[in-house]
Amino acid sequence: MDLWVAIQALILGVVEGITEFLPVSSTGHQIIVADLIGFGGERALAFNIIIQLGAILAVIWEYRRKIIDVVVGLPEERQAQKFTVNLLIAFMPAVVLGVAFADLIHEYLFNPITVAAALVIGGIVMLWAERRDHAIRAETVDDMTWTLALKVGFAQCLALVPGTSRSGSTIIGGLLFGLSRKAATEFSFFLAMPTMVGAAVYSGYKYRDLFQPGDFAVFAIGFVTSFIFAMLAVRALLKFIGNHSYAAFAWYRIGFGLLILATWQLGMIDWSTAIG
């Protein structure tokens, strides 16, 4: 492994870690940055699986106490049982629709116009969700009912559309359905755990032939970097929403969507190859 490859792995690990749990589309950022630094090919596909796994393990580690409490209390504690049921209910819609329509979505929606439109529309909806008057129905994730969990689960299905952002769809959905900012954000984190681990395992098996022993060092750099920066991003986001709305992220989504359209129209990035 030469120095430049190590730097590429470091850069992409940072990008994944920072953007995965922010409502801004980590995939879009990965595509642009990977193109700018010349990181592509089959190695890149396997590498992306590894760094996504690093990011999700970071949030699992960050919430390890909550997870342990739920697991230990599951046999007898009603709150632990309720939380687990809510998580499973929210998890299932994306699994069913993802398995049923994944190939069609990849064939017809993986293009720059879809990605840009999803970013812009998501940003506009996020602004509306933040500015409208609505009653808070759940201050914390423990206050959520199964119906609220199901609604957020259906909102997560929107993330099947490229550019929507998994965290963006669940956070926006949570806000629209009456969750507080903290509850919407934390439930998005918890819902990411089974969703992303499942996706990583599925993709890892599907593309298992792409994992080569010679790439171990590159993968290790990306994994560790993604883990560290995802943990920092999660902590920073929770602190940020304590005193701020999601409006800044909404405007960022809109600007990023327009940037994607510009890079595509001007031929600066070959998006057809990147996401086709």
From Swiss-Prot:
The gene is uppP1. HAMAP family: Undec_diphosphatase (MF_01006). Its main location: membrane. It comes from the Bacteria. One of its GO terms (cellular component) is plasma membrane. This is Undecaprenyl-diphosphatase 1. Its EC number is 3.6.1.27. Belongs to the UppP family. Pfam families: BacA. GO terms for biological process: cell wall organization; peptidoglycan biosynthetic process; regulation of cell shape; response to antibiotic. The lineage of its organism: Bacteria, Pseudomonadati, Pseudomonadota, Gammaproteobacteria, Pseudomonadales. It comes from Stutzerimonas stutzeri (strain A1501) (Pseudomonas stutzeri). It catalyses: di-trans,octa-cis-undecaprenyl diphosphate + H2O = di-trans,octa-cis-undecaprenyl phosphate + phosphate + H(+). The chain crosses the membrane at residues 44-63, 85-105, 109-129, 183-203, 214-234, 249-269. Keywords: Antibiotic resistance, Cell inner membrane, Cell membrane, Cell shape, Cell wall biogenesis/degradation, Hydrolase, Membrane, Peptidoglycan synthesis, Transmembrane, Transmembrane helix.
